[in-house]
A protein has these predicted regions:
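Internal helix-turn-beta structural module
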Residues: 324-410
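An N-terminal, well-structured beta->alpha segment
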Residues: 1-43, 51-52
Length: 410
């Protein structure tokens, strides 16, 4: 392993995530918060929910009640006046259903004088859920969508129609109370109706689109689930004010600043990356190979969210798969490729992402591992662990997509 490049990678990861932590972002957003004369309630959902809620209560002083639902091991302590729950991700579980039921109970019977502060971050589609269909069927549909390679917009178009809270229905449940929503964006282009499936946003997707997605991926649906795909979601909401705070653009900008501080010339390739993870990794490797003779220290950055089409039964995540796919293409170069999820988790693993450099391919071969066979089995986690290529941050408390970086040293 090239320790100089690895140390640079670790520094870039730390700096980029630090820049998009929710504490200061929440304080900025709440400068515009004007609650009504009645009760002020807090509901927070997503991977960053606990940190967002903690920052909000610290800023406001107190709330009259609240519910937080986030991933397992993401609650860091108690918050005055707020009940905190942990639940399943990326597949919703009974914890998701229970916590969301508590949130719906909390907002029942509100008046026009009351205000709901709704804090939303990525992961909310699984964590904040109360389905019309059975929990078991929703879990099965979610697994089908994850396995078939559907992108996040396609997944959420389906999930909205099966849910009592998605696609604007949570805001409807809060009415006539006002809803002030603060959103950490984890979807390219910041489409409010798609972030966590838009519980407090009018839905721009249509039944026609949902049915087309079900047909495209040959989803196995019950008669009731298929009927629900034909029921339109709310298209207007007059009780919601929304503020977006934090995005993949800020993540990439912070990474670029740190690259420059380390002596690299940063170049942002895109902040709208959306393709197969292994294709992105191979592309970044080809960029490094093309510029290997330039005599410059370069950093190529790409922000967004790739997808993985599952063909095997291994363990990994999209960032680990992206990095591993780059290893053969940079073999022997004074170069590295790494990719990390800003939330600190990548797939169902304890890693945030993966790192490879010009020495990785040889190290894998020495361990009896073939990159292409590992990718076929979707087992990037174990391969990268073998060569110390996992990036582990622990839960970060934020979630604004992923950043991939390709470094080239002279």
């Amino acid at each position: 392993m090239n320790m100089t490049l690895r140390h640079d990678a670790d520094a870039i990861v730390r700096a980029s995530i630090q820049a998009v932590l929710p504490d200061e972002a929440i304080r900025r957003a709440l400068a515009e918060f004007r609650p009504g004369p009645g009760r002020t309630l807090l509901v927070a959902a997503g991977k960053a929910a606990w940190q967002m809620a903690k920052a909000a209560v610290d800023t406001l002083g107190q709330v009259d009640g609240g519910v937080v639902v986030t991933k397992y091991d993401h609650v860091k302590g108690s918050i005055p006046g707020v009940d905190c729950y942990e639940a399943g991700h990326p597949v919703p579980d009974n914890g998701s259903f229970f916590a969301t039921a508590r949130a719906l109970e909390l907002v029942q019977g509100l008046t026009a004088d009351d205000t709901v502060l709704f804090l939303l971050s990525g992961g909310g589609s699984a964590l904040f859920e109360q389905p019309f269909v059975s929990g078991e069927e929703l879990q099965d549909i979610t697994r089908q969508l994850l396995a078939c390679g559907a992108d996040i917009v396609e997944m959420n178009t389906i999930r909205k129609r099966l849910s009592r809270v998605k696609g604007g229905r949570f805001a409807q449940a809060c009415a006539p109370a006002k809803v002030f929503a603060v959103v950490l964006s984890d979807i390219l282009g910041d489409p409010l109706d798609m972030i966590a499936s838009g519980p407090a946003c009018p839905d721009a997707s249509t039944c026609r689109q949902a049915l087309a997605i079900a047909e495209k991926y040959d989803l196995k649906l019950s008669g009731e689930a298929r009927r629900l795909l034909t029921v339109e979601t709310p298209k207007t909401l007059d009780n919601v004010t929304t503020r977006i705070t934090g995005s993949v653009r800020e993540l990439c900008a912070a990474a670029a600043v740190q690259c420059r501080a380390l002596g690299y010339e940063p170049m942002l390739l895109t902040d709208q990356l959306c393709c197969e993870a292994r294709e992105a990794g191979s592309f970044l490797a080809s960029v490094l190979s093309t510029h290997a003779g330039d005599g410059r220290r370069l950093a190529f950055l790409a922000g967004g969210e790739t997808v993985v089409h599952l063909t095997g039964k291994g363990l990994g995540g999209r960032n680990q798969e992206l990095a591993l796919a780059a290893a053969p293409g940079i073999a022997g170069l004074n170069a590295a490729v790494f990719s990390v999820g800003s939330d600190g988790t990548d797939g169902p693993t304890d890693a945030a992402g993966g790192y490879v450099d010009g020495d990785t391919n040889a190290a894998l071969q020495a361990a009896g591992l073939d990159v292409f066979e590992v990718l076929k089995q979707n087992d990037a986690y174990h391969a990268l662990k073998e060569v110390d290529g996992l990036l582990v941050t622990g839960p970060t408390g934020t979630n604004v997509n992923d950043v991939a970086v390709a470094l080239l040293r002279t």
